[in-house]
From Swiss-Prot:
This is Ribosomal RNA small subunit methyltransferase A. It comes from Ruegeria sp. (strain TM1040) (Silicibacter sp.). Specifically dimethylates two adjacent adenosines (A1518 and A1519) in the loop of a conserved hairpin near the 3'-end of 16S rRNA in the 30S particle. May play a critical role in biogenesis of 30S subunits. It is found in: Cytoplasm. InterPro entries: KsgA/Erm (IPR001737), rRNA_Ade_diMease-like_C (IPR023165), rRNA_Ade_Mease_Trfase_CS (IPR020596), rRNA_Ade_methylase_Trfase_N (IPR020598), rRNA_adenine_dimethylase (IPR011530), SAM-dependent_MTases_sf (IPR029063). Its main location: cytoplasm. One of its GO terms (molecular function) is RNA binding. Belongs to the class I-like SAM-binding methyltransferase superfamily. rRNA adenine N(6)-methyltransferase family. RsmA subfamily. PROSITE patterns: RRNA_A_DIMETH, SAM_RNA_A_N6_MT. SUPFAM superfamilies: S-adenosyl-L-methionine-dependent methyltransferases. It catalyses: adenosine(1518)/adenosine(1519) in 16S rRNA + 4 S-adenosyl-L-methionine = N(6)-dimethyladenosine(1518)/N(6)-dimethyladenosine(1519) in 16S rRNA + 4 S-adenosyl-L-homocysteine + 4 H(+). Pfam families: RrnaAD.
Length: 280
């Protein structure tokens, strides 16, 4: 039995249920319970908090989160093969784990969880970025979550915390740093996973700010930033031409030289541009 709980080691679990990670679902399983406990601790004190977990797989992180004191976990798993392993965990922690077989993009966490809510997940690589952008761009702020503790490929993690002027700086950095404090909390080598991915991974911890750093409409900012970085080597007057016929006027109003390139523009200045566009 595991030291974390009275459940079998994860290698035994995946053997019993004949589980193997599927590339089509972006899966890589974490089977070291000491490591999943360490990741769970990055989410902070979970006592009195509900937790949303996406893609729990055989439940390694789930077990870590429960042992760290999560009040209740909503685990959304698309892969039906993993459900029996998760139901075993639910039986060991009565009333504290709800498992839904479905797509995280289609499920409202607030229908199942009670604030305060934290999100912790070894995100499937094929939906991780889309989920993060969605969590960072709701119309209303603060969001349903207090914090996000998320596993990404190292390259994606570096894009979230990147600063202007760096190659990694782009849409993710701007949206994350506009409304949250973001830091890389933990690095993991490929060998931590089964099967080992070709690249290293990292855990990013984001804490929601009470209000955005600068005023801006989320939808407008998101559209502007996406257009600007879609052609990041072009001058903004060219890359943003499709956003507004008067884009040079809006850039000047925001104090941004129209000849500037996207990677040189700060979060504050992108927000000023979004406000100018909103005024029309």
């Amino acid at each position: 039995m595991s030291a974390i709980d009275n459940l079998p080691p994860l290698r035994e679990v995946i053997a019993t249920h004949q589980l193997s990670a599927r590339k089509s679902l972006g899966q890589n399983f974490l089977l070291d319970l000491n490591l999943t406990a360490k990741i769970a601790r990055q989410a902070g004190d979970l006592t009195g908090c509900d937790v949303l977990e996406i893609g729990p797989g055989p439940g390694g992180l789930t077990r870590g989160l429960l042992s760290e004191g999560a009040r209740k976990i909503l685990a959304i798993e698309k892969d039906q093969r993993c459900l029996p392993a998760l139901e075993d965990i639910a039986a060991a922690y009565p009333g504290r784990l709800e498992v839904i077989n479905g797509d995280a993009l289609e499920i409202d966490p607030l229908a199942h969880l009670t604030p305060p809510i934290r999100v912790a997940a070894n995100l499937p690589y094929n939906v991780g970025t889309e989920l993060l952008v969605r969590w960072l761009t709701p119309k209303e702020w603060p969001p349903f979550w207090q914090s996000l503790t998320l596993m990404f490929q190292r390259e994606v993690a570096e894009r979230i915390v990147a600063q202007p002027g760096s190659k990694a700086y782009g849409r993710l950095a701007i949206l994350a740093q506009w409304r949250a404090e973001a830091r890389i909390a933990l690095s993991l080598p490929p060998g931590a996973f089964t099967p080992p991915p070709k690249v290293s991974s990292a855990v990013v911890h984001l804490t929601a700010l009470p209000e955005p750093r600068y005023p801006a409409d989320a939808a407008i900012l998101s559209r502007v930033v996406a257009a600007a970085f879609n052609q990041r080597r072009k001058m903004l007057r060219a890359s943003l031409k499709g956003v507004s016929p008067q884009i040079e006027d809006h850039l000047n109003a925001a104090g941004i030289p129209p000849t500037e390139r996207a990677e040189q523009v700060s979060v504050e200045d992108f927000c000023a541009l979004a406000r100018s566009l909103e005024k029309g």
